[in-house]
Amino acid sequence: PNEVMTVDPVLYDALKKVSDANCREIYLGPLYASLENLCMSNDDAAAAQFDPEKDDDAAEEAAAVAAFAQNPDDISMEFPGENQVCLHVSDAYQAYAAEMGYTAYLDFFWMKNAFLIDYLADTIRGEGYQLGIISSKDGFVRCLDETGEKEYQYPLYHLSGNEIQSHGTMMYEGPKSIVFFHAYQAGSPDTYRYYQYQDGTMRTPYLSASDGKDHTAASELIVYSGEYGCADTLLAAFFDYQAESLSGELLKT
């Protein structure tokens, strides 16, 4: 931290985009590491040790990291230009990180594939390809088709109780970016990002910088855009998905 580094242009653009959107969740790197430990636990007792809703030490850690993450004086990014980035970290946060044994302050975590798919889409288009779909198993889709001559399908699901049920199909024409927020495991990449307790309680990767805990306004939310990529679509809707309830008016904007 506190040194200017030259990074790959793709990484620079991704960091700049997150910073411009004021998405402080990228600064929750230490808590994402704890969440991975929770999700890889073999039983509820082991998982609870990493759960701020069930363990006092975990709750104290989540609150501390969130407090640092919220405060630009404690952690922030500066972009001098020329693909240069400087991660500013306060002495207080560095001391706490050393005490806790943290190795990373930043992590895109569940957001990473949105940026990767956008990069692949831009690269493919740059080579002259204008058809096809790029998708990831954790809920990001880019349809490149600009002809308007073909109709595409996106399956819809809904969590009812503990059962994931099919709820039809969304038909669309390209180009389109689709982001699928979901409060349950929906694919193999979710294995290390979600954990379900025996009582049905689910922990998700949607941690908030407000308190370091996961928040979801609904069991699922599909957001799409014909103008923006997956990353911009994600950043535009993420805070609404973390609200106490979904606002249709906000999502329309």
Language-model segment annotations:
Residues P1-T253:
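Mature catalytic core of soluble alpha/beta enzymes
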